[in-house]
Structure formats: structure tokens, C-alpha cells
Amino acid sequence: VTKHVAILGCGPAGLMAAHAANMMGWSLSIYSKKVKSTLHGAQYLHKPIPKIDTGGPNLVSYKLRGTPEEYRSKVYGEGWDGTVSPEDLAENHPAWDLRQAYDWLWKQFEPWIVDCDIKPMPYISPNLWNAMHKSDLVISTVPRKVWAQEGDLFESTKIWALGDGDPDGGLASQHDFTVICDGTPICNWYRSAKIFGHSTLEWPYRELWRKPPAPGAVIVEKPLRCSSIGAGDFIHMGRYGAWEKGIL
């Protein structure tokens, strides 16, 4: 008997889950607003995806100015005691093209997407609820807060971020395939990255700052960890889907 998986969300994480299920011979349905995600700034794959041309690999140079402790304090203040990316990632490591992979996945799985709103309980549509409960497995890549229940705890940090969407543009005046992390007081930003021609510049968020540190910068909430019983029988994937730092 063929097993069936219901996948919630059609961003990169959702369509990667669909690709994995399809490779395993499962039938699948994808539920989401049928809108392709816009990928901003320097994002990339840390591993290739089987049976997809993901470009590369290209070697990323990852440099830290200052110490991991200084970097942790600059980005998170006293609110985070876990590791930071300069500790988690090798100084030089390979990267594959996320945008190229997502373009392929969208062309492959766009016809499988059921266009619908995914609303929190108890507002979820009866049709979607029934479809989920008839499935052998539910994979949720939508923000985990959608399923939050009273007493759940979601930890996060705010940052300012400025990401380009044009490979011919660029914000970071640095070589491609480089990431610079800065824990020193010399500059106000903490990370400048340029990968596959796309750049991201990030600053720590301070409540006292009245204006963005640069024109176009926006406030971004970055998940750290959560303690949640909501939708405990689902598999939660993606950084916002799992609400966990280090999950991409």
C-alpha cells in the first residue's frame, strides 16, 4: 500500500520534503498559498540534493573578526548561551545553489500544490484538517507559531537585515563566496555575506535605535529554539517551521 504525506508550505523546505517523498515512492499533496517564495540575499545549500542540478560546489570562505564570545554578545546580547555560526561552520566549506534548486523544484511540484490558506487552530479549514488526518504523515514547514498553544515558549532574536535580490547588484563590497563575521566594536554590522552574487548585511537590533542602520534594512525575527506541544504529531522542518537555530 502506497503511503501518503501531506506537506504544509511550498517554500524551499516544503518542496525539498516533496522531492524526498517522491523519491521514496510516497504519494503526496502540498497545501499552501500557491506563491513562489522570493529568496533574499546570501542563501545557499550546505549539501547537494540528490537527482537535482544544484550547481557548484563553490568553496565559501568563512572568516571571523574577534572571538566567538564577542560575536555571540554582539548579536544576541545575554539572551543566547548556545553556539554561533563561526563555531558551527568550517572556515572554508562547499556551497550549492539554493535558487537553482528551488527553481527546479517549483517547476516539478507546482502542479501538486493545493492553493489554500493555512490558518491556526481552531480556524483551519475542515477540508484541510480532514486531508491531514487521512495522511500517514504530516510535514509542516510553515512558521511553527501557527500551531502555538497556551504555555508554548518561542525564543528568538531580532536583527536588522538588508538583502539584495539582483545578482548584478550587490551590497557587500567583497569577493563572491565570502562571509565575514565581526564581533568587534570597529563596525556596527556583525555579518556581511556574498554568495552566488547575492549579498546580505546584518546588524544587531537595539531597542534604542529609532531608524534602520541603512536605507532598506528591515527587522527580521530569527528563531533560536522553542518548547511547543502544538501539532506534536507533525514533523516540523525548516528554520521557521522547526523554530530552531541552525536549521536551514
Regions found by a protein language model. Give the residues of each.
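Dinucleotide-binding Rossmann-like beta1-alpha1 core, especially the glycine-rich loop
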Residues: 34-92
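C-terminal catalytic lobe of FAD-dependent flavoproteins
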Residues: 221-248
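Helical element adjacent to the flavin cofactor pocket in flavoenzyme catalytic cores
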Residues: 84-137, 141-142
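Conserved FAD/dinucleotide-binding core of flavoprotein oxidoreductases
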Residues: 146, 186-221
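Beta1/beta-strand and adjacent pyrophosphate-binding region of the FAD-binding site
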Residues: 1-13
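Central helical "cap/lid" subdomain
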Residues: 39-40, 121-188, 196-198
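Glycine-rich FAD pyrophosphate-binding loop
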Residues: 10, 22-42
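A short, Lys/Arg-enriched amphipathic alpha-helix followed by its capping loop at the start of a domain
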Residues: 5, 17-26
